[in-house]
Amino acid sequence: MLDFEKPLFEIKNKIESLKQSQEKNDVDLQDEIDLLEASLERETKKIYTNLKPWDRVQIARLQERPTTLDYIPYIFDSFIELHGDRNFRDDPAMIGGIGYLNGTPVTVIGQQRGKDTKDNIYRNFGMAHPEGYRKALRLMKQAEKFNRPIFTFIDTKGAYPGKAAEERGQSESIARNLVEMASLKVPVIAIVIGEGGSGGALGIGIANRIMMLENSTYSVISPEGAAALLWKDSSLAKMAAETMKITAKDLHHLNVIDSVIDEPLGGAHNNIEQQAIDIKQAFVDQLEQLQQQSADELVEDRFNKFRNIGAFIEK
């Protein structure tokens, strides 16, 4: 339960208590239950339409929030995962493969968090090593060779900062991806589904179109990290989140991303099937637009998109 959801938790407890009493004592409490359920829906709408940036950070970090592998079966047909960077080893924190989007062959790449402690250790908490980014690049170059559109799911706190990762060229692998992705001659569409952290997110994020789920975040550093750097106090993360403009709405307003996909009431984890349907429709719509462009136009479109980010006019 998140801090801002405490009022909802209290109502849910009352509903559950009434249901148990109704079953145990064989009394009709349905009217009271209906009233509480209506109250729960109203309160949920009230809370989720007035979320603060720090609230959205908490939602983006939820353990039960859907991951790349949760969405793939709903969006793509006949997905086959491919492994390895052909240089060192496979990286479970970065998954990728081929499949079909409404009959069109596509390449799918995404960061993958774990679902529990054991899985998180296996997936390295969604923080990819250099071999993960090199695997992603291998699949992207393969997609370009066979003229397959590329879809990437961004969901990471950042690239893994460990000693071994640095020894194997973490920064070089990300930088190489930025260079190579900028010149890919196929449509590239990215979506931030959870946290989009720093260079780890950018390593698969140089796309013609970038979308974000309503409660996802995208930033150069975590709010805790920013607070520690700016004010020498990581406990001021909530204040940092307000200042950093890391929410989907703020980034859309700043033209860093192209569109925001609404989430079901209470977050994507409350209705993954509906969320996947919305993502798939957005993918289809964006792909139809990009397929009207030539290979050279796709590259120019991508270059201009990133060239214009951060541009401003002094008056």
Swiss-Prot record:
Pathway: Lipid metabolism; malonyl-CoA biosynthesis; malonyl-CoA from acetyl-CoA: step 1/1
Listed GO biological process terms: fatty acid biosynthetic process; malonyl-CoA biosynthetic process
Compartments it resides in: Cytoplasm
EC number: 2.1.3.15
Classification via InterPro entries: Acetyl_CoA_COase_a_su, ClpP/crotonase-like_dom_sf, COA_CT_C
Chemical reaction(s) catalysed: N(6)-carboxybiotinyl-L-lysyl-[protein] + acetyl-CoA = N(6)-biotinyl-L-lysyl-[protein] + malonyl-CoA
Keywords from the UniProt entry: ATP-binding, Cytoplasm, Fatty acid biosynthesis, Fatty acid metabolism, Lipid biosynthesis, Lipid metabolism, Nucleotide-binding, Transferase
Gene Ontology molecular-function annotations: acetyl-CoA carboxylase activity; ATP binding; carboxyl- or carbamoyltransferase activity
Keyword Cell inner membrane: no
GO CC annotation terms, alphabetical: acetyl-CoA carboxylase complex
PROSITE patterns cross-referenced by the UniProt entry: COA_CT_CTER
CoA carboxyltransferase C-terminal domain: residues covered: 32-289
Disulfide bond positions: none
Family annotation (NCBIfam families): accA (TIGR00513), AccA_sub (NF041504), PRK05724.1 (NF004344)
Subunit structure: Acetyl-CoA carboxylase is a heterohexamer composed of biotin carboxyl carrier protein (AccB), biotin carboxylase (AccC) and two subunits each of ACCase subunit alpha (AccA) and ACCase subunit beta (AccD).
Family under the similarity heading: Belongs to the AccA family.
Role description: Component of the acetyl coenzyme A carboxylase (ACC) complex. First, biotin carboxylase catalyzes the carboxylation of biotin on its carrier protein (BCCP) and then the CO(2) group is transferred by the carboxyltransferase to acetyl-CoA to form malonyl-CoA.
Protein name as annotated: Acetyl-coenzyme A carboxylase carboxyl transferase subunit alpha
Record organism: Staphylococcus haemolyticus (strain JCSC1435)
